Each structure stands twice: as structure tokens, then as C-alpha cells.
């Protein structure tokens, strides 16, 4: 945390999202105000990441160092990227669900400069997907995105 402050804060935070809605290894149940810390990874997160370890869950670390949700929220801009059907429920909760520690990514609903980039497969459970597409297609030029 001190190193982040000494560097002037975080300008751009680029995130993925887990199938259970975790971001930055802040698993479900993480405090929405949490700071950078060592975390124990859930079995689901370890299963999701086994592909990077020869599909061997036993080779996946059980702990990690992560920025907390409060730390992430202090970033000036946040971009979250999600692709594929396996992320559809998490994206639905992130965008349309209530803010809850059970779906840590939902805290991003309160970020003033958060952008969510998803493909059609990840968008498949969004109830307002057509509205989101329409508003993006007709956004004012001054928005610059």
C-alpha cells in the first residue's frame, strides 16, 4: 500500500473476472474495503487457473498477493475484460446485480471511471444487453471511447 501511495497511486487497473465474480483474487466474502494482502485461493479459482499449470490443480499455488477491493477502487480508471460463456453469470452479477461481498466485482458499480469490455458470450445473461449496445452505439463523440 505504501509503495502504491509513493508512486502516486494507480492510474489504470486492468482486470479479469473469475467465474465466481472475484477480481484481483478477492474471492467471494472478501471485504469490499480490503487492502493489498496475502489471500488463500478457493478451490474454484485454483481449478480455473489449472490450465496455466498443465491442468494440474496441485501445481496451482494456494496463496497469492493481491490488491484489495478498496485498493482497486482507488484506481483512477478501471477496465475489466471478460470473454466466454463461463463468465456470463459473473458479468450479469457485476453489471445488473446488487453490490455484495458474495460477488466482489460488483463493487465496481461504484467506481466513477469503470469500463467493462465483454464479448457476446459473456453478455448472454444480461437482461439489458440491447440497451447497453444501443447506448454505446449512440454515445456522444465527446466521450472519446
What are these regions (language model features)?
Residues 1-145:
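Conserved phosphate- and dinucleotide-binding cores of soluble alpha/beta proteins
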Amino acid at each position: 500500500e505504501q509503495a502504491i501511495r509513493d508512486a502516486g497511486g494507480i492510474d489504470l487497473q486492468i482486470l479479469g473476472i473469475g467465474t465466481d465474480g472475484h477480481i484481483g483474487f478477492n474471492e467471494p466474502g472478501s471485504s469490499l474495503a480490503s487492502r493489498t494482502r496475502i489471500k488463500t485461493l478457493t478451490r474454484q479459482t485454483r481449478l480455473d487457473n489449472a490450465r496455466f499449470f498443465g491442468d494440474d490443480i496441485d501445481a496451482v499455488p494456494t496463496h497469492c498477493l493481491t490488491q484489495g477491493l478498496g485498493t482497486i477502487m482507488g484506481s483512477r480508471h478501471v477496465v475489466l475484460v471478460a470473454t466466454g460463456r463461463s463468465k456470463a453469470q459473473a458479468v450479469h452479477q457485476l453489471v445488473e446485480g446488487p453490490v455484495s461481498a458474495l460477488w466482489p466485482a460488483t463493487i465496481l458499480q461504484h467506481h466513477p471511471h469503470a469500463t467493462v469490455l465483454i464479448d457476446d458470450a459473456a453478455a448472454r445473461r444480461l437482461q439489458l444487453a440491447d440497451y447497453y449496445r444501443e447506448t454505446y452505439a449512440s454515445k456522444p463523440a465527446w466521450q472519446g471511447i
